[in-house]
Each structure stands twice: as C-alpha cells, then as structure tokens.
Amino acid sequence: MRNEYPRPDFIREKWMPLNGTWNFQDGTDKTPVKIQVPFPPQSRLSGFQKELTSDRITYQRNFFIPAEWIGQRILLHFGAVDYKCSVFINDHCVGFHEGGQSSFTFDITDFLSGGEETLTVAVTDYLHDETVPRGKQFWKSSGEFIWYTQSSGIWQSVWLEPVNEAHLEWIHFTPDIDQGTVEITYSLSDCTVFPCELEWDIRFKDHPVSHGSLTVSEKRGKIIVDIFKNKALRGSFHFTGWYWSPEHPNLFTVSALLKSRNILLDQVETYFGMRKVHVHGGRVYLNNQPYYQKLLLDQGYWKDGLVTAPSEENYIQDIQKAKEMGFNGCRKHEKAEDPLFLYWADKLGFLVWESTASFWSFSPQSAAVFSQEWTRTIQRDYNHPCIILWNMMNESWGVPRLYDNTQQQHFARSLYHLAHGLDPSRLVIANDGWEMTENDICAFHSYKHGSLDNPDTQAAFSLGLQSLSGLENLVERPLFADRFVYEGQPVMLTEAGGISLKTGKDKKSWGYSDTDSEESFLAAYSHVIRSIYASDLLCGFCYTQLSDIQQEQNGLLDEDHQFKTDPKKIKAINDSRETTTSFSTIEDY
C-alpha cells in the first residue's frame, strides 16, 4: 500500500491516507470488484489488471473523519486522476477536474454527514481519443513500438487533511544566489481574517539562518529574506557550500506559521534550494559555473504499477542507480512525475527536466487543455530545485504541422512564453527534438549512431555532431521550424542511444540498434558517448533510456529496474570526459 506522505514539500502534521482497497466498476458493470488505489486498473498491483471495456470507470470507498478534526475544514486531495472526474461525497457532487497529470483539491466539509462518509469518484478516460493529453499511453488495446499499456483513473495518492478556515494555500521560493536572497511569495485562504501574522523560521543543516514575522493584510504577498546576511563577496567561491547542485544537494528547511493574536492557525514544513540556472555564450550554467549535463531519458514506468511506482523506495533506487552510472539528471518523458520523485531528486541531487503528457491531434480545445495542465504543473512543482527546465513538447507531438503552420507555431511560442511568464527562474524548451521555434536550448534527437558492423555510419554520426550544419544530417526533420533560425543557444543531444542488449528471451523486443553481449553493448554505448564528448559544440546529452519498458527493451536497467550491465563500466565511460575541458565559444561555429 502506498501510504507515505504524498506531498513532502508542503507538510502538515495531520492527514489521513485514502490509498488502499476501494470498490471499482468498469463501465456499466453492476457488481463492483476490489481495486488497490493508487495503481491504475490495467496494472498488476491494482488487483484488477484488465483491459477496460469502457471510457467510464467508478471508484468508491467509505471513511470516518477523526473526532479531533471536527470543527475544521476538511480538504480532499488527489495527486492525479487520468483523465477527468467528478467527485461525490454522500452522493453530493463536490467538484470536477479535467487533466490527467495535475493535482487538485476539494473542500468537502459542507457535504460530510458526521458519521460514515461515502466517497465516489466517477472517471472518464477516453481510451482511443488522440485529442486529449495521453503521453505514451497507446490508443490501441496493447502496446507497440514506443507506446505502452494505458493507465486510467486514479494513479497518484488520495488523502484527507484538516485545516482552519484561515490557512496557507501555497508558498513559492525564488532563490537569488547573486544577491544572496530568497523571495517568498504566498497565498492565504479566502476565509482568512486580516490582519494576521505570517512567521517563518529558515534553517540550514539545523543551524538558524533567518527568523522573522510579517503583519499580513492581504490574501497574497511576498517577502524578501537575506540568506547570506549581507556578507561581502557573495560570489561563487564563498557560498558554494550553501548552493544546491547534484554534487552538493544542500537544502534550507522552512517552518511557516500563520497566527492571529498569538493563536496558531496553520503550520507548514517545507524547504528550498539556493540554485541558479541560466544560459550564456552557448553554454548552460549552474550556480554561475558551466555545467555539463549527463541525463537519462526517464519515462517513469514500472512493470507491475505502470505509471505508478510500487513504493517510494523505487524512486530512491532509480535516482541512486542513475547516479551510480555517472548521470547527473534525467529528462522526464511525457509524464508529470509524482512529487515524491521530485522530493528525492531534491534530496539526493539529481537534475530534472520536467515534462507532461502530450496530446496527438491539434485543435484549439486540445491546446487550451494542454496549456492549463502546464500551468498547474508549474504552480505545483515550482519549489523543487532539482527542476531546471520545463520541457513543454516533444518532437512536434500534438503539433504535426509545426514546421510551416502559423497557428501551431504561435501555440508552441505561447507555451514558451507561458512558462517563462509563470517562472522566470528556469529554462524552457517549447519543442524538443526538431522543428524548434523559441527554445533556451537547441535540443535535437538522433538515433543515427550506427552499429558496430557499420563503421561508415558510426563515422558519419561522429562527424555530424561537430557542427550545426552536420546536425541537419542526423535529425529526422529540420532543426528549426520555417522562419526560425539558430540564435546562439546551447546545443544538446537530448535523445540518443536506445541500444538494446538482446538476450534471446524475447524476439519481439527491440531497440534503436541491437547488441548481443555485454561486451558489444558497452562498445556501442561507448561509441555514442565518446562521439558526443568529441564535439565541442555540444554541452550535454540525454541517453535513451533508464529502463526497459514492455516491448521497448533498450534501457540501462531491465524491466524490474535492475542493472543489465556492470554500472561501474557505464560510469567509466560517462566519466571519460575531462571535467576541466574548456568550452569553445559558440561564435566558433
């Protein structure tokens, strides 16, 4: 059962998990069966593990509100439900949500009976509709190629939480390492009676950093807190021990208290990292230093849970294994990952390019829903220092005419500006892979690395990585959309490899190229990575991929997320690039 605290970046002491056994109905089935939430009904861990017969499914369970919660407002939280749902308490509709990747909350207080309560979630997931965001979920009955089994309904945690009428809705932290400050923005509930006091206590490794309070007279506001205490020379060489990075994932813990006349109304435990990311001269900088990204494509699938990890420990192990192989981050692919993963990426030190599920057929309605999902995702995940980039779209999915269609180009550009408007502290890629409009990184995909028995193709791959003109020969479509050109952005190969190590167990499995032994796999892997390292044009890469997924058997881990080869050998290849390499300036190209 998934009963870990589901929102570790915004913790309240009192809460109640609603994960576990629920009643479940597929379509018009009259007799409910048992299902384990939050695992999708198509997964083994759900206990149902069947292909759905209908777009409509229903969940139901009973619960009691603890006696000590009486008199408070009761919030019902959903981590994510795919695709849209209506929520009922005791047959009264308390709210509706559309969007399979985003979290949502309803205040259910006024619908409670005071006894045994009945919670019903009526879900609609359009199994074959290509206009709704679906990511890698195939619209046919079974997975093929790079498409996987569908994951419908509740797929992240459900829980209850008591709060006073006056409480904190959210807190955002925006660090500024150049000034040594953090900007704290906040929002209070609509029922808050003003004036009241907002108090904060910031600590670093249990050492006090800042303690203060502010009289609040409006629902929303901001505070600037001096973290480095106005000390001289706040630059890179004096406060790096306080910065967040994959090598040193330093976090500041925060207690935020809302009070009225010295009466505690709300208390939240949270955290932030002092971290800066920007681009300059064709390079990506982390904390004002050039930083070479060695990323893994991570699609967040598990054999038994599909898009839902079997446990919190699975997130920890994935990050630890990736770091053990010499990677410093991941590009999340077609999925807004569970906040628990982001928490452990913060704690363990692991860069994240955040994503969400794409739709496939363009329409203004699809574009509106997709934009709304991104708005919610950025709002929810804003505080995670591990996230350095919002990766809005992939390979023109959902915008198939992006190259020359003005409307679709406007949409791609609108996503870029939406993300920067909501969050100026991170990088943004509107479209990853090719047909770029406005991107902070020139991010291209190529699997034309060749095979060990085709040295000419291997040589062409290595040569193509040396120049912008050479990249055009390595991608499936033009690098830039019509009327858009390269403007000096950092250049990264953000999908490459996908090499399969075939063991003969499953002839239907595939990769972008095949090997038949650990020795041949390591030779092929080394060719890809060393070709990347030989290019002064590139400032990072993303290798496909972390783990095998169903028929796509091209991961560095198998479908059980265990090593397929010696991780020390992978790390030796990844570490073969000299960290002291001096970058050429982009003007050289």
Which functions belong to the PLM regions below?
Residues 329-561, 569-574, 582-588:
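Substrate-binding/catalytic cleft of secreted carbohydrate-active enzymes
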